[in-house]
Amino acid sequence: VDHTLKSADRKEIGRAAELIQESVRNHGRLHVTGIGKPGHLAGYIASLMASTGTPTYFLHGTEAVHGSSGQLVPGDVVIATSNSGNTEELMATVLCAKQNGCKIIGITGNPDSQLAKASDVTLIADVTEAGEGGPLNRAPRNSILAETLVLQMLSVVLQADAHVTPEEYVMHHPHGALGKLREDEV
């Protein structure tokens, strides 16, 4: 965690935020995609960003090349996440998104990857020093944590720039403990 927080390129996070904000100002939308565990992360981040002021949609990593790319329009932004940055199915989705006129923000642990090269902005979620952890050092543990932290940093920048009020947040998240206005917020 410390390595990810220290190595995160805040300037590039700012560039990613600007790309998204420009798209939203022009009635574009943000989509988040990944394959496997990063696909689950994409669903979480899409929900988080949507509830905190940035219209965001989950884009299924493989279904996109089987018709779901119809949700993409020119000017949209797609965040694609992959530790290796070379996942074949994800790269097919990224190329499809680019052909549909979308800008790409790549989240990867590999700055020399296909994803990094295809992206308009690349955010590095590096786990080279720590590896993945666990007995086989293969299951995506640390890479998912690093990708989550980088995307959460981006979500904080977007939420701050959107100036989301407690009342607006509750409109997007009306139920549960988070959906109640606190006495100090009224």
Model-derived features: positions:
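Internal, active-site/partner-interface "lid" segment
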Residues: 117, 130-135, 159-186
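Glycine-rich phosphate-binding loops that contact phosphosugars or nucleotide phosphates
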Residues: 21, 29-162
